[in-house]
UniProtKB/Swiss-Prot annotation:
Protein name: Protein GrpE
Any Pfam family the entry gives: GrpE
Entry function: Participates actively in the response to hyperosmotic and heat shock by preventing the aggregation of stress-denatured proteins, in association with DnaK and GrpE. It is the nucleotide exchange factor for DnaK and may function as a thermosensor. Unfolded proteins bind initially to DnaJ; upon interaction with the DnaJ-bound protein, DnaK hydrolyzes its bound ATP, resulting in the formation of a stable complex. GrpE releases ADP from DnaK; ATP binding to DnaK triggers the release of the substrate protein, thus completing the reaction cycle.
Family label: Belongs to the GrpE family.
Keywords: Chaperone, Cytoplasm, Stress response
Keyword Cell membrane: no
Species of provenance: Streptococcus thermophilus (strain ATCC BAA-491 / LMD-9)
Lineage: Bacteria, Bacillati, Bacillota, Bacilli, Lactobacillales
Length: 204
């Protein structure tokens, strides 16, 4: 009888110890679960922070892209405005530089007529002197406007001269030199108003 009681007491003690171990393990498991939950919560918060930072970074990059686009548009518009201003300035300069072109076209025929009149024989001294004064006045007026006679002696230059006739070249008159001026040529600064019409020596 006594042995049975002792055996039961031993079983009760073992059961109690087992229960305590189970409780302890349950407690540890609960703590582990809480740690996992806490870790998950922290990970979630970290993920939210990363997402927020990524969102802010994306918005910043988008804002920077828009700023660069606006800057590029401004630079293009600014460059275009500068080109327009430059072209307008060049056009004004060209107009100013060649403003006398129409004047020259109107005066040059009259100057040609005066030269032809002076070549006529039998002019009285007074008439000749009067024509020469008019001629000089016209030439000076043209010079003031930048209009000058093209030199037509020496070698023929197709940039300034127009050959309307040729003559045989010889020892005294080399080929491609000007023999005679049929009509004077004129230029306005660097622009040819009309080439000089000349007779040129050529090899046979």
């Amino acid at each position: 009888m006594t042995e049975d009681i002792k055996e039961e007491e031993v079983k009760e003690e073992e059961a109690t110890e087992t229960t305590e171990e189970v409780v302890e393990e349950t407690k540890e498991a609960t703590e582990t679960t809480e740690e996992v939950v806490e870790g998950t919560k922290e990970a979630t918060e970290t993920t939210e922070e990363v997402v927020e930072e990524t969102k802010e970074t994306s918005e910043l990059e988008e804002a920077q892209a828009r700023a660069e686009e606006f800057e590029n548009k401004y630079l293009r518009v600014h460059a275009e405005m500068q080109n327009i201003q430059r072209r307008a300035k060049e056009e004004r300069q060209q107009l100013q530089k060649y403003r006398s072109q129409d004047l020259a076209k109107a005066i040059l025929p009259s100057l040609d007529n005066i030269e032809r009149a002076l070549a006529v024989e039998g002019l009285t001294d007074d008439v000749k002197k009067g024509l020469e004064m008019i001629q000089e006045s016209l030439i000076n007026g043209l010079k003031e406007e930048g209009i000058e006679e093209i030199a037509a002696d020496g070698e023929f230059d197709h940039n300034f001269h127009m050959a309307i006739q040729t003559m045989p070249a010889d020892d005294e008159h080399p080929a491609d030199t000007i023999a005679q001026v049929f009509q004077k040529g004129y230029k306005l600064h660097d622009r040819i108003l009309r080439p000089a019409m000349v007779v040129v020596y050529k090899e046979n």
